[in-house]
């Protein structure tokens, strides 16, 4: 297989195989299994059940199966490879599609005007290698992404699940000199679950005074569930999941509202919402927060880490002016 295999999805998601990638040891004398932290140089070092290795030099895929022939062990085996489901341009409506088993982005795009995605199902997205760094490769894959500027970007009534990175996102990193405007962004009435980040957004501060900002952004009526519970937990950086993820970026914004959503459990962070200026933070209203005891949140300007406890509601009201919020605290085993 020439294109990188992202993951094995077995029996339509009952199980997944773990994609082994190699990282350099601290002294660079050998390479290690990214998860087990033991010496790994080739397929011959596979020994854990349902670990697999895709050999980049010849394209051969090796799967370790302790229970015999995988074709007899499993009723179905899907192997997403490194490609997008769709790559969108300006003035596109994607309506009533099922997009599954895609190794890169389900729907990807650069700077785009008028992209509407509605009534779609996207699942088992991402996990292939994006690039090879100095010490280890980086995997990637979002359900729906615009990287760059946008106008009239609408995602409505979609079911998005099991994405290696974010379910839905608009983003631009902190490089370059160009102005970037993200405006009229609406994520509404979606169910997003078992992704590392249900919704991810960030706007990096550009060089040489370029103008980068978001305006007229609305997240409403969404059910966001179980960030950090899906196959994206294969990632080595396991301490990043959150239901809404802004990272610690510049994130200049105006008229940014998060209204009437359900936030249902996430670990280790419930939310990660921050900006360089407190006036750029979104306003929250009438959201329901189902919170795992013992987790935390990264919030505010400047960003700080807060414990999820009985004071969480007061904290959200103070930082984001939330009115009408509901806060429900559960143990991890309380809710299936």
Locate predicted features.
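Acidic, glycine- and Ser/Thr-rich low-complexity intrinsically disordered tracts
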Residues: 1-49, 53-55, 251-259, 266, ...
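Extracellular beta-strand/beta-solenoid scaffold signature
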Residues: 2-5, 49, 78-85, 101-108, ...
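Feature targets compositionally biased, intrinsically disordered low-complexity regions
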Residues: 12, 58, 67, 84, ...
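Residue-identity detector for threonine
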Residues: 16, 30-31, 41, 57, ...
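Secondary-structure junction/capping motif
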Residues: 69, 207, 214, 238-248, ...
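Right-handed parallel beta-helix
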Residues: 90-101, 113-133, 140-143, 150-171, ...
């Amino acid at each position: 297989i020439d294109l990188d295999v992202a993951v094995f999805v077995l029996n339509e998601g009952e199980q997944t195989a773990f994609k082994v990638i190699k990282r350099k040891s601290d002294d660079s004398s050998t390479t290690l299994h990214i998860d087990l932290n033991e010496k790994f140089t080739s397929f011959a070092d596979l020994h854990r059940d349902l670990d697999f290795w895709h050999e980049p030099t010849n394209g051969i895929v090796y799967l370790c199966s302790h229970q015999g022939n995988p074709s007899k062990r499993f009723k179905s085996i899907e192997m997403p490879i490194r490609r997008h489901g769709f790559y969108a341009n300006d003035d596109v409506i994607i309506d009533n599609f099922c997009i599954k088993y895609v190794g890169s982005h389900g729907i990807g795009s650069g700077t785009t005007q008028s992209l509407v995605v509605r009534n779609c199902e996207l699942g088992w997205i991402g996990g292939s290698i994006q690039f090879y760094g100095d010490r280890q490769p980086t995997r990637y894959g979002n359900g729906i992404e615009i990287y760059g500027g946008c106008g009239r970007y609408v995602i409505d009534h979609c079911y998005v699940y099991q994405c290696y990175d974010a379910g839905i996102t608009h983003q631009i990193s902190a490089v370059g000199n160009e102005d970037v405007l993200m405006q009229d962004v609406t994520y509404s009435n979606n169910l997003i679950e078992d992704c590392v980040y249900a919704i991810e957004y960030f706007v990096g501060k550009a060089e040489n005074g370029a103008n980068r900002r978001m305006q007229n952004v609305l997240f409403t009526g969404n059910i966001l569930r179980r960030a950090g519970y899906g196959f994206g937990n294969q990632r080595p950086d396991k301490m990043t999941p959150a239901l809404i993820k802004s990272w610690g970026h510049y994130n200049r914004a105006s008229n940014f509202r998060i209204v009437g959503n359900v936030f249902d459990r996430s670990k280790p962070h419930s939310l990660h919402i921050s900006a360089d200026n407190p006036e750029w933070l979104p306003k929250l209203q009438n959201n329901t927060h189902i919170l795992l005891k013992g987790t935390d949140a990264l919030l505010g300007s400047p960003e700080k880490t807060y414990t999820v406890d009985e004071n969480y509601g007061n904290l959200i009201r103070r930082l984001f002016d939330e009115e009408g919020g509901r806060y429900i605290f559960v143990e991890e085993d309380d809710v299936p």
